[in-house]
Amino acid sequence: LASSAASDVYKRQHSDCVFLCFTNATLIDEEFCKEVQKLGNLSFSLSLEGFEEANDGRRGQGIFQKVLGAMDLMKRYGLFFGTSVCYTRKNMDAVTSDEFFDLLIEHGCRYSWYFHYMPVGNEADVELMPTMEQREYIYKRIREVRAFEGGKPIMLMDFQNDGEFVGGCIAGGRNYFHINANGDAEPCVFIHYSGANIRENTLLECLQQPLFMAYRDNQPFNDNMLRPCPMLENPEKLQEMVRETGAKSTDLQSPESAEHLCGKCEPYAAEWKEHADKIWAEHPFVKKGYKNYKSEIEGTDAK
């Protein structure tokens, strides 16, 4: 989107769509903001991991100030933007503090995505995964901050704990899927397995690949909407689907087996089940949120 020609693709060819871009914000400058201002259908989620020391420790020296500078520019041009926060065991206190939320609001953020740390990759550090107490806390804290009464003027969305609003996992083409830089059609940005590539297959063929069909046959992966993911909370599900469909790892640097990936999640899933079931049982609106009619007809709707 560095040129007016690229802007035309969004505005003229796809004026009936709204686009959301996740970015580290390092390429956002005044000229860029002027181009985006002409569009009206493009929003940005700027990656931020906490305050300066924590953020730059993960994303590089000086990035925190660049992000704040980009926010101030976008605010000046009246652009609609927010942040993308990955919460971990180490930064949980910071990214859920009043000071952090107030900082985002001060610099013009209208919303913020909160993503649970996923131990994806052969070298992923499982020690960064939140504790059970931390996950319970952020479940309650997000709802507190975005409440109409007593909350703050910013819309917060928790990718892992807001499953109740979308019927659990939306991946695998149910409502969403991911295409990586190589063109591989993956179920989710966190799930690097596929049996189709957009450079070799049509969009419909990508959606009909065996792995995606297995996803849709099995959704929701759990009737407890606080246990939505076939990797993090139901690791046996992803292993089974990858094995039965013959999907291959799409990690170009270091291919990871589903068994290795899900093995890192099994202790977490077992421990979280007790906490999640307790919270869900106390939920005032206990319901699936999504009905898989195919599995119900075939008599397999028991999770």
Language model: regions and residue ranges:
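Flexible mid-to-C-terminal extensions adjoining Fe-S/redox cofactors in radical SAM and related proteins
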Residues: 190-303
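Acidic (Asp/Glu)-rich catalytic clusters
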Residues: 11-14, 35-40, 75-76, 104-107
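Single conserved hydrophobic/aromatic residue that forms the stacking wall/gate
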Residues: 1-6, 10
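Short beta->alpha connector loops
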Residues: 24-28, 89-90
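Short beta-strand/loop segments at the ligand-binding rim of alpha/beta enzyme cores
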Residues: 15-20, 80-81
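Radical SAM enzyme [4Fe-4S]-AdoMet core and its adjacent flexible, acidic
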Residues: 47, 56-168, 172, 181-182, ...
